[in-house]
Amino acid sequence: MKSIVNKPWGSFEIIDEGEKYKVKKIIVHPGGKLSLQSHEHRSEHWLIASGFAEIIIGEKIHNLKENDNIFIPKGSKHRLTNIGSENLIVIEMWFGDKLDENDIKRYEDIYNRN
């Protein structure tokens, strides 16, 4: 059975993983916002399964809806925000040589995490 990890913005669960990939289901509550962050060892690909997202990658803002997807290159500053009135569901795919939850550098976080 997969375990759900609760976060201040919602939750996630790992759907599948291998040596060089990980797939997660992320749920972001309305108004929820992940930290502005980057990763040294992995790139990410996000698929919007349902809801409306504002995604910042570098200096660009992207508004995505159900069935849209976006690639986040390794080392890029990025942020995910639920701009809809329902839960945002994102399928997040990680790719890289070191897939660790601690591979995160936070630049800004509304929940005051480091």
Regions found by a protein language model. Give the residues of each.
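Short beta-strand His + acidic residue motifs that chelate non-heme Fe in jelly-roll/DSBH
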Residues: 35-36, 55-56, 72, 78-85, ...
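Short acidic-glycine-tyrosine-enriched beta hairpin
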Residues: 59-77
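A generic "binding-loop/recognition-motif" signal
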Residues: 32, 41-42, 60, 76-77, ...
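Double-stranded beta-helix
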Residues: 2-6, 79-114
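Glycine- and acidic-residue-biased ligand/ion/polar-headgroup-sensing regions
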Residues: 41-54, 58-59
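A short, compositionally biased micro-patch
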Residues: 29, 41, 48, 73-75, ...
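A short glycine-rich, His/Asp/Glu-containing loop-to-beta-strand
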Residues: 2-43
